[in-house]
């Protein structure tokens, strides 16, 4: 069987849950410290970052929905300083204001790694060619898949949508 990142893809349950808890605690502390909206919502629920001691404690965190994201448009939910944001993506906004997501350089590296793992599970290797037909605009799909394919070392055909005849020619 092929693994892109064998240590992470074959990690034991106990180690996986330890990593998940560490990352959850780090994320909760970062959003509590850096994002007034999240801090206020947590305070309304009577939750502090140190209350998250297990994965089951995820249930203590306040539920947030699309409306909350739209109400804090465009940058009210960013946990990183704006000068660390290297890319912005957004939803189409068909139900109101678009939902905006800002990515740091590290976010993009992690995103490419996660996509590479998924592609590796599907059997993609550096010997393959992957045609990316997702859009390359504000939607996150096109670039996310693109950089995951490149991380594996496979060839990317960044065709986006449309141009069916050209797509067939390149395949």
Features from the language model and the residues they span:
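Conserved AMP-binding loop of ANL adenylate-forming enzymes
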Residues: 120-148, 152-154
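Nucleotide 5′-phosphate-binding alpha/beta core
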Residues: 1-90, 95-113, 117-121, 125-127
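Conserved adenylate-forming
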Residues: 26, 37, 142-171
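Short acidic, glycine/Ser/Thr-rich loop/turn "cap" segments at secondary-structure junctions
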Residues: 96-103, 127-133, 152, 168-171
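Conserved aromatic-histidine-acidic binding/catalytic patches
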Residues: 103, 137, 159
């Amino acid at each position: 069987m092929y693994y892109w990142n064998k240590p992470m893809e074959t990690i034991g349950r106990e180690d996986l849950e330890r990593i998940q808890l560490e990352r959850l605690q780090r994320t909760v502390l970062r959003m509590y410290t850096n994002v007034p909206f999240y801090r206020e919502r947590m305070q309304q629920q009577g939750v502090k970052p140190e209350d998250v001691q297990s994965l089951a404690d995820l249930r203590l965190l306040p539920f947030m929905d699309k409306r909350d994201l739209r109400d804090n448009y465009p940058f009210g939910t960013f946990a990183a300083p704006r000068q660390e944001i290297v890319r912005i993506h957004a939803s189409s906004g068909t139900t109101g204001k678009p939902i905006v997501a800002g990515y740091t350089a590290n976010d993009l590296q992690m995103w490419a790694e996660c996509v590479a793992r998924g592609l590796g599970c599907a059997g993609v290797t550096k010997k393959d060619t992957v045609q990316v037909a997702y859009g390359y605009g504000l939607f996150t799909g096109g670039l996310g898949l693109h950089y995951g394919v490149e991380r594996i070392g496979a060839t990317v055909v960044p065709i986006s949508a449309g141009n069916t005849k050209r797509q067939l020619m390149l395949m």
